[in-house]
Amino acid sequence: MKIWIKAICITSFVIQMSACSSSAQTKNDSRPAQAVQNGIQQHVEGKDIVDIPEAYKRKLKGLETVKGKVLHIKDGDTIDVNVKGQKQTVRLLLLDTPESVSQKIPPQKMGKEASFFLKKQLDGKSVTLVYDQGPKEDKYGRKLAYVFCNGIHINELMAKSGYGIIAYIFKPNTTLLPEMLEAEKEAKEAKAGVWSIKGFVDEKNRHYNRNDAA
């Protein structure tokens, strides 16, 4: 009987020590972590997250920025954002992804994939919108912005991942054009996403061949 009681006590002690060790490890690992996604540094959500990394801050200095929360992903390059209690439709600047919900043409290849990828990055998350030097809206009344979330430039991430191409290039809304073009170049060389479909991207005119439906 004494041996049995002793065994129970030892087991209980081991379990308690394991729980304490696990708790301590969790506490020590609660600092913001960093990871790399498709070559672009991203910051896992945590206390000391910087919305816009220093390298971008220098280039974007003086441009208007606003904070908001993503309400809805409309497609791969358009989102609805709550800004100070008002819903704003935002088009990701310098980016064009294949159509997934257009009423004018059938859904295109990679359109749904682009929307899903963007949703995974932004749905329900806080973002910082950066407006460039030129017009802040397009002809449809959508805001034109660089979108940052947890230290990631989302426009650039979409291009680098092959879910979109660089398009609608109008000065002076071109502050981050070099970074966007470099991201697109890497996706093209890797034959990622839209670049994996032969003849899909019309590079000269910077649009998609619309007859390539999903």
UniProtKB/Swiss-Prot annotation:
Residues 1-24 form the signal peptide. Residues 64-197 form the TNase-like domain. This is Uncharacterized protein pXO1-141/BXA0211/GBAA_pXO1_0211. Keywords: Endonuclease, Hydrolase, Nuclease, Plasmid, Signal. Transmembrane segments: none annotated. Gene3D superfamilies: 2.40.50.90. The active site is at R91, E99, R142. GO terms for molecular function: endonuclease activity; nucleic acid binding.
